[in-house]
Amino acid sequence: LNTFQLLKASLMEPKKQAAVRILAIGKIMRFVFLIILLLTIAAFVEFTIGLNSVSGDLDGLLLYIEEIEWLLYPLAFILLFVSTTLYHFIKISLFAWIGMAILKAMKRRGEYRHLWRTAALGVTVPTLLSFIIGFFAKNEWLPLLVSLVTLVYLYMAIKYYPKMPPQRK
């Protein structure tokens, strides 16, 4: 699967989300970093637009920012990328851990590494939706809604994991 096929699978194909458990981790990492890069670029553009639209009350600060602009923007972009990457990897890992509990409750076969790959695709749509909604409205319930949607995506994908073999007596 290429990156665009992974994006399509993350949008609407829970069966393929479950099937990515057997893909190489490198393909999943490339997909995750691409999503993080796109989110970082969009957030950085929002940051620079917001920085340029600061009111005239801060003339001294604006002058200082204009003087160090060549240093501020690259460092801000790198810091934003690193912090976004850390946040998303922690989020994917936590959802994979929760997915392990769902997996055991549904009596399905799988390992944490499989669920990490599935969770990496499962968080894509809710993350993109929350990012888009965040541009238009600020809502304190949005993180909870994103988490619930991610769990639904994860649950739908786990349904396609193989069942545990029956216990031998």
What is each stretch, according to the model?
Residues 20-34, 60-71, 85-98, 160-168:
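Hydrophobic alpha-helical transmembrane segments
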Residues 69-74, 92-169:
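Hydrophobic alpha-helical transmembrane segments and adjacent short intramembrane/lumenal linkers
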Residues 4-8, 15, 59-69, 113:
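Generic detector of well-ordered alpha-helical segments enriched in charged/polar residues
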Residues 42, 46-47, 78-98, 148:
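Hydrophobic alpha-helical segments embedded in or immediately adjacent to the lipid bilayer
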Residues 35, 79, 83, 87, ...:
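Alpha-helical transmembrane segments of multi-pass membrane proteins
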Residues 1-39, 169:
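N-terminal juxtamembrane cytosolic/stromal segments of multi-pass membrane proteins
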